[in-house]
Design a protein with these regions (language model features):
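Alpha/propeptide regions of enzymes that mature by internal proteolysis
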Residues: 1-213
Length: 215
């Protein structure tokens, strides 16, 4: 039997930190998840135009078997730059994949982006897209407590005709098993059952997170 975690956030899983950063003028943002050292990861890439970074390194047949962070970002292909600056920030502490002696460790930071270039923000950023700064800013803000909704990677997101955003949830059982999720929702189609006025996911809630919301 599972029940909601203490804060109903992915950071209820021990050792996980999350940070958000936004550029309100441009209408975009970045989110970083920093797990404990030695954490493993896997990826399932879907969609007609996915945008990812270092996902191939997660293949269990490959050499790298741990990650140092995961970055979610707006900005389409430009947003992947947020992971590069996050790698620089995290790498300063010496964290990363050890290749050999006397060579810098290489932070492993898979990333995925969403398309938010059509949300009306000022995308005329010239020679300096904002994602380098957003990656660093999100990294410096990483903590156990973080905001949801119109923040981070979800800042410029849409959910059909509605505003998208950043979501999170956690579950625990009596044996101490903890599961957490972090989502940047930028979906196509309707997220609402207009016959009931509720979100389609309301039937799967645990503590009335969605059933009290009517559109």
């Amino acid at each position: 039997m599972f029940y909601s975690g203490e804060n109903n956030l992915i950071t209820d899983v021990d050792g996980i930190l999350v940070g958000n950063a936004e550029d309100k003028e441009i209408g975009t943002g970045t989110t970083i998840l920093i797990p404990p050292v030695g954490s493993t990861a896997a990826a399932d890439v879907r969609g007609g135009a996915p945008g990812t970074r270092e996902v191939g390194a997660l293949n269990p047949y490959n050499l790298v078997d741990t990650i140092d962070a995961v970055v979610l970002s707006g900005g389409s292909a430009w947003g992947l730059e947020a992971a590069s600056s996050a790698a620089n920030y995290i790498g300063k502490s010496g964290r990363g994949f050890k290749t050999s002696e006397n060579i810098k460790n290489v932070p492993m930071i898979p990333a995925a982006i969403l398309f938010d270039l059509n949300n009306g923000g000022n995308k005329d950023w010239g020679d300096e897209p904002p994602y380098n700064n957003l990656g660093i800013e999100a990294s410096t803000r990483a903590s156990e407590k973080f905001q949801l909704g119109n923040v981070g990677a979800g800042y410029g997101a849409k959910a059909g005709s509605l505003k998208g955003g950043l979501g999170s949830a956690s579950f625990e059982n009596k044996e101490g098993l903890k599961i957490g999720g972090l989502f940047a929702v930028n979906s196509f189609g309707s997220v609402v059952n207009y016959e009931t006025g509720q979100f389609w996911g309301a039937s799967d809630e645990l503590n009335n997170e969605l059933s009290l919301i009517h559109i």
